[in-house]
A protein has these predicted regions:
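A short glycine-rich, His/Asp/Glu-containing loop-to-beta-strand
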Residues: 1-34
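Glycine- and acidic-residue-biased ligand/ion/polar-headgroup-sensing regions
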Residues: 22, 32-52
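Residue-level marker of beta-strand positions
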Residues: 25, 67-69, 75, 86
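Double-stranded beta-helix
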Residues: 60, 77-108
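Conserved hydrophobic/aromatic beta-strand scaffold that supports enzyme active sites
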Residues: 15-19, 37, 59, 67-69
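Short, surface-exposed beta-strand-loop junctions and turns on beta-sheet-rich folds
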Residues: 34, 53-55, 93-96
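Short acidic-glycine-tyrosine-enriched beta hairpin
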Residues: 51-73
């Protein structure tokens, strides 16, 4: 989808910037241990997620200045719907191997 600028990576917290190109997207994935909060710095995005309590898929457009919180065990995908964009991510730490792909971005 672009690249990641990881500026801090610790056991209890982490921070990175996700940089996207036009119409780039992430895999539909989830984490069992990692919670994430995103702040849209630049560009417009669509976040899609599955609510595992009702099995339904939801989506929300994210514009600059918007914050979105992604809880653990919540499958999600981010798509850039503008020419380019970037999102700041804060999380509750690095947990190796804690990303599980539901659908590859090529099939979304």
């Amino acid at each position: 989808y672009g690249y990641v600028l990881e500026w801090t990576k610790h056991e209890n917290y982490g921070g990175k910037i996700l940089v996207f190109e036009r119409q780039a997207k992430t895999d539909f994935a989830y984490s069992l241990k990692t919670e994430k909060s995103w702040f849209v710095n630049d560009g417009n995005f669509m976040v899609r997620w599955i609510d595992t309590t009702d099995g339904k898929t939801y989506q929300q457009e994210l514009q600059p200045g918007i914050v979105f919180h992604c809880k653990t065990n919540t499958p999600y995908s981010l798509s850039c719907i503008s020419d380019k964009g970037n999102i700041a991510e804060c999380n509750n730490g690095y947990h190796e191997g804690d990303e599980y792909i539901v659908l590859k971005k090529e099939v979304l």
